[in-house]
Amino acid sequence: MLLHLILILKSFLPKRNLAFRYDIVALSLTRKILLKHQPPENVFAALYIDSLHGGRHQIMPGFCKLSCPTLDVGPGLGRFAASHFSERVSQDRQAQGRERRSVLLPQERRGSSGRQPLYSLLPHRPKREGVIGAALCYTSASHSLSPAALLPPVGRGKDRRCGRQVGAAGLLRHVGRRRQFAQLTRGPLGLPCALLEPLPLDPHLLDKGRDVGVGGCHDHQGQEDGLLLHGGPEPVLGPQGVIGPAYGRPHANVHALRHELQHGPLGDPPRLRSG
């Protein structure tokens, strides 16, 4: 009933205020997915909010058949929303088509062909890029994502590297990655860390029966190695006791995780407390 009331009130809004109209539809769809927590097989649902792109929100299906995970940033709410609100999305697409030049101008300047890598979903630079929030719901489709898909761009100008280029250059650590997952788990939707399933990143570790992902290091037999990273400022419990506050982040392997817990990332003081 509340959703119908919102849609009725939204119809009286001016068509130029597309950001607020998309906000209601996207948040309602994401809320349904997260509350049910049983999305269809091989579906990746994500809410993408970017003030630089006119506040457009995208709800997209999974990337089960794509070798390189990408995000469609074309006009409208995407195929997932179109299947639920076909009339509303068609009307909004017509209204947004008249504003296509102003809405898509920042993306066209960057030379994009209308598709954007997966790292654009993550608020790795909230102040610089204008990202105000994101909510991700991982399913079995996320197991096929490569580690390079979660790496943000590094460098400026001609030295700017993305995806696999970052991994090949050894630039696996990023300044904003610790804040990135902290904001992800404390987003505008109040998404708890429990909803973020472990995302396998290293296939060699998967062969040994271990997952390394957003939540840290997990064992398929249900045993934790004592180095589990949480998505919030809670203290991390390790073999030596309380190590200190940490934030969940993707890691290439267990050795990098242990080394970072002992010595800290580049530019940060050590977080290991001896004794």
Swiss-Prot record:
Q: Where is this region: Disordered?
A: 88-120
Q: For bias kind Basic and acidic residues, which ranges apply?
A: 88-111
Which positions, given as ranges, span the membrane?
Answer: none
Where does the signal peptide begin and end?
A: none
* Record keywords, A-Z: DNA integration, DNA recombination, Viral genome integration, Virus entry into host cell
Task: Kindly list the biological process annotations in GO that this record carries.
Answer: DNA integration; DNA recombination; establishment of integrated proviral latency; symbiont entry into host cell; viral genome integration into host DNA
Specify the superkingdom. Answer: Viruses
Family assignment? Belongs to the 'phage' integrase family.
Q: What functional role does this protein have?
A: Integrase-recombinase proteins are responsible for catalyzing strand exchange between DNA molecules and play an important role in the DNA replication. May be required for the formation of concatameric complex replicative intermediates and/or their resolution before encapsidation.
UniProt protein name: Integrase homolog
Phylogenetic lineage: Viruses, Varidnaviria, Bamfordvirae, Nucleocytoviricota, Megaviricetes
**Gene that encodes it:** INT
